[in-house]
């Protein structure tokens, strides 16, 4: 994905395309149903978003069941994570979504899920700070990867309720010119993104499979 420099939050009064919002809401709702059916969004965990334009994103309202979303469960925020035209409360982790949109110009959908596999992997690999994925055919799902003879590291960042601190940790990884297709948060889950919702869903499915393989290998070797 193309990395850009961070941009400041825009005025929340700027207009956005209502038709684009409606289309994004439907894509987010469909993703929630699909991922919920796969067991990736237990309870009211997880959060999803899509870019509306350079200044706004559509994001899930905090505390909603992601497998049973309606258009009323999708709201608009600016790139500073502030609600636009709504008294609803966006996900507490909205800044992680807007950070991705600011840093990756071609990211148009962000998914964060909490599967058992993702959560266990985040705990197991937290001391190392990353999960190393080598030699998997499925790595070719990520843009720019054309062979199984490749290696990517999935960083595992310490969990915190202070989102600016977590944003800075992610940004430090990007500034170090390390490839980034997604990241884990210790004891929490995974963030990944795509040029559209379909690609973001493929990335979630790929990470779920690859992390499961790494956990199985650990068990078999023990």
Predicted regions, residues:
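Glycine-rich flexible loops
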Residues: 2-222
């Amino acid at each position: 994905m193309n990395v850009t420099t961070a941009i400041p939050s825009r005025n929340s009064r700027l207009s956005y395309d209502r038709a684009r919002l409606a289309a994004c809401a439907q894509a987010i709702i469909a993703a929630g149903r699909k991922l919920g059916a796969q067991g990736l969004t237990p309870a009211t965990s997880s959060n999803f978003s899509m870019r509306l334009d350079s200044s706004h994103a559509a994001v899930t309202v905090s505390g909603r069941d992601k497998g049973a979303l309606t258009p009323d469960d999708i709201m608009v925020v600016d790139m500073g994570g502030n609600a636009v035209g709504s008294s609803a409360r966006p996900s507490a982790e909205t800044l992680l979504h807007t950070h991705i949109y600011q840093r990756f110009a071609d990211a148009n959908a962000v998914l964060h899920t909490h599967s058992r596999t993702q959560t266990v992997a985040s705990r197991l690999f937290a001391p190392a700070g990353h999960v190393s994925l080598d030699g998997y055919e499925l790595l070719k799902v990520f843009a720019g990867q054309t062979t199984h003879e490749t290696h990517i590291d999935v960083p595992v960042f310490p969990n915190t309720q202070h989102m600016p601190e977590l944003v800075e940790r992610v940004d430090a990884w990007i500034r170090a010119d390390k490839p980034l297709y997604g990241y884990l948060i210790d004891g929490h889950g995974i963030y990944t993104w795509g040029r559209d919702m379909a690609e973001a869903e493929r990335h979630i499915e790929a990470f779920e499979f690859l992390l499961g393989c790494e956990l199985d290998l650990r068990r078999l070797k023990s």
